[in-house]
């Protein structure tokens, strides 16, 4: 990270951080994309099982990953103050937190998985596939969260190219392990859909080992000594949880509504489940663009606030949101004209492709609102503002969006489409509320004179 004084310099730095973030976000989303595509090509019933499993674990993964992501603004502001010792201490504490969260997630799954699946009244084979997938995936909980800590630390330093190369490595690892275990290649058992869970877990173990080597060898990471042993200091856990829990529950609230919609699709049959998952899965890939801009703005804004430069932070915010809207428009135009090709990636039957195309059409609307809402969430995290965005997320998705879907399902013949309309309503509301919150936060900084432009 470095100071900038002109718009051209800021745009250059924004893209210097953004492009690697975008590439590794695409690589990150590709893990579930690979699971979905490979499983769908194996058998439609296995795709339905993996889809249900994803609806169950995605909210918890994003909740815990959101808590860990609080490391980015914390380190970003410490970096702005040039506090290397503080950075080393807080990163190691986050590693303890990551392990603790992984153990908690495993225990929740152990206790609640069977009751949750039994309540859904799924076809027996779909339920079995979902259960086995999640049990095998749980082997990767600890490396997933520890890697998330390391990646967040690297990102906060502005070294997003390093994170990019690490995440790119995930793609061939995941493809190799998935292919081997789904189809039973290279002497390994043919596990079908559950093999994708084990393949992803194994890929993250390898990725964690590589990330630790990078921490020890990279010349810009070695000076921070983040792997130097530190005992747990519970007093240092206050800020990570004070900031991380609202961030985590904010993301959880958003992902949970999407997951709940996925679960509600169960009553419409396995083909609707599979088509819904296919459309949603590709939407997640498209979401990598605004999410990447969100992460880049968290890194930059937190650094500028640490430097006490509100004027520069505002300029980055303007550039970031404008970039997100332009990229989203171009992406959605391409998506609209390529719906048949995209649908064909996930399945082969004509009825499946036609239904998936309809779901993809609905996704175009909520992705446009995401292009504004996601960057604003990242900006607010850079300001260390997390509690109010969490409340606004609950209001937009659960108080406005979900009731709309339930009412439309009950009062009309829209069927599964009612819940896609609910997602659109929730994201539109969330977008508007977050815009108001950002304006309020910036106004407080300006009025109180807490941060001055240089």
Predicted segments with their positions:
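Short alpha-helical transmembrane segments in multi-pass integral membrane proteins
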Residues: 1-21, 75-142, 188-245, 301-366, ...
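Transmembrane helical elements of multi-pass membrane transporters/channels
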Residues: 16-35, 136, 147, 203-207, ...
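Transmembrane alpha-helix boundary and packing residues in multipass membrane permease domains
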Residues: 21, 25, 36-37, 73, ...
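Residue-level hotspots within pore-lining transmembrane alpha-helices
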Residues: 23, 27, 31, 60-64, ...
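Helix-terminus/linker motif at the lipid-water interface of multi-pass membrane proteins
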Residues: 26, 30-48, 117-124, 182-191, ...
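Small-residue-rich hydrophobic transmembrane alpha-helices
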Residues: 47-110, 144-158, 162-163, 262, ...
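Short runs within selected transmembrane alpha-helices of multi-pass transporters and secretion channels
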Residues: 65-68, 137-155, 163-171, 196-212, ...
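Structural signal for membrane-spanning alpha-helices in multi-pass inner-membrane proteins
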Residues: 109, 152, 178, 182, ...
């Amino acid at each position: 990270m470095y100071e900038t004084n002109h718009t051209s310099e800021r745009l250059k730095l924004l893209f210097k951080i953004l492009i690697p973030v975008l590439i590794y976000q695409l690589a990150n989303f590709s893990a579930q994309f690979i699971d979905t595509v490979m499983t769908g090509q194996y058998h439609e019933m296995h795709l339905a099982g993996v889809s249900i499993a994803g609806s169950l674990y995605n909210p918890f993964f994003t909740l815990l990953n959101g808590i860990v992501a609080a490391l980015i603004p914390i380190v970003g502001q410490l970096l702005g103050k040039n506090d290397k010792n503080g950075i080393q201490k807080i990163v190691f504490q986050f590693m303890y937190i990551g392990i603790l969260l992984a153990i908690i997630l495993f225990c929740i799954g152990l206790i609640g998985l069977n009751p949750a699946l039994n309540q859904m009244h799924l076809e027996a084979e779909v339920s079995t596939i979902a259960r086995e997938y999640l049990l095998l995936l749980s082997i990767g909980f600890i490396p997933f969260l520890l890697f998330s800590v390391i990646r967040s630390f690297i990102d906060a330093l502005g070294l997003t190219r390093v994170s990019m190369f690490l995440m790119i490595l995930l793609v061939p690892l995941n493809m190799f392990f998935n292919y081997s275990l789904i189809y039973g290649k290279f002497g390994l058992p043919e596990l079908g859909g559950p093999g994708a869970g084990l393949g992803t877990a194994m890929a993250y173990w390898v990725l964690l080992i590589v990330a630790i080597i990078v921490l020890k060898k990279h010349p810009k990471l070695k000076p921070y000594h983040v792997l130097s042993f530190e005992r747990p200091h519970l007093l240092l856990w206050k800020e990570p949880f004070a900031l991380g829990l609202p961030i985590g529950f904010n993301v959880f609230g958003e992902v949970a509504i999407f997951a709940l919609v996925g679960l509600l699709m169960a009553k419409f049959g396995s083909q609707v489940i599979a088509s819904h998952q296919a459309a949603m899965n590709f939407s997640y890939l498209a979401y990598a663009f605004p999410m990447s801009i969100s992460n880049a703005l968290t890194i930059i804004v937190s650094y500028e606030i640490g430097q006490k430069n509100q004027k520069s932070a505002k300029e980055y915010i303007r550039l970031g949101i404008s970039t997100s809207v332009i990229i989203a428009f171009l992406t959605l135009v391409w998506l609209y004209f390529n719906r048949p090709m995209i649908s064909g990636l996930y399945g082969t039957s004509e009825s499946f492709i036609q239904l998936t195309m309809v779901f993809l059409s609905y996704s175009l609307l909520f992705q446009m609102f995401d292009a504004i809402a996601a960057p604003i969430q990242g900006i607010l995290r850079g300001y260390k503002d997390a509690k109010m965005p969490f409340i606004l997320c609950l209001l937009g998705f659960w108080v406005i969006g979900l009731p709309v879907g339930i009412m439309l399902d009950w009062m009309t013949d829209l069927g599964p489409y009612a819940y896609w309309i609910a997602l659109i309503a929730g994201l539109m509301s969330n977008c508007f509320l977050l815009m108001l919150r950002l304006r309020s936060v910036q106004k407080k900084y300006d009025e109180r004179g807490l941060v001055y432009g240089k």
